[in-house]
A protein has these predicted regions:
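Conserved catalytic or regulatory cores that recognize and/or transform ribose-phosphate-containing ligands
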Residues: 1-141
Length: 141
């Protein structure tokens, strides 16, 4: 089973924990690792320095289009979400539109009152372990 890891790029501990604990059971797809295959450090530095501009447009396209292609190859989206992140919200919507299940790990429970997040989510979990226990039992991994 292929799982796309979604969430703020600041959530590095979540990504590390998931890969350390579950990469032998599931095929974990981390877009932050995948993006390194699509753009080089020089392109990334230009984007971070300038932000949106004509010269950075190609970099933005490579990032977003690559993430969308990676989502299409996955069986579900697992999202760690305690704060709003534009990219994360877009990934949720894309998965929803593709009928790919969306599972949100939200320890603070802050997202469980947002009608838009609820609408596009299959299930919420309080912890990483509870989410992956569900996936293991549901998908017989």
């Amino acid at each position: 089973m292929k799982i796309y890891l979604s969430g703020s790029i600041k959530e590095t501990e979540y990504r590390k924990e998931v890969k350390d604990k579950y990469s032998t059971i599931f095929e974990i797809k981390d877009p932050l690792e995948d993006v390194e295959k699509r753009i080089n450090q020089k392109e990334l530095d230009i984007f971070r320095k300038i932000g949106f501009s004509a010269s950075a447009r190609d970099v933005v396209d490579k990032i977003v289009e690559g993430d969308i292609e990676l989502i299409k190859k996955c069986d579900c989206l697992v999202v760690f979400m305690n704060m709003y992140s534009a990219g994360t919200i877009m990934e949720i919507r894309i998965a929803y539109d593709l009928d790919i299940p969306v599972y949100i790990i939200n320890p603070s429970r802050s997202m469980r009152k947002d009608p838009w997040i609820i609408y596009h989510t299959n299930l919420f979990f309080d912890s990483i372990d509870s989410c992956f226990d569900f996936l293991r039992h549901t998908y017989k991994q």
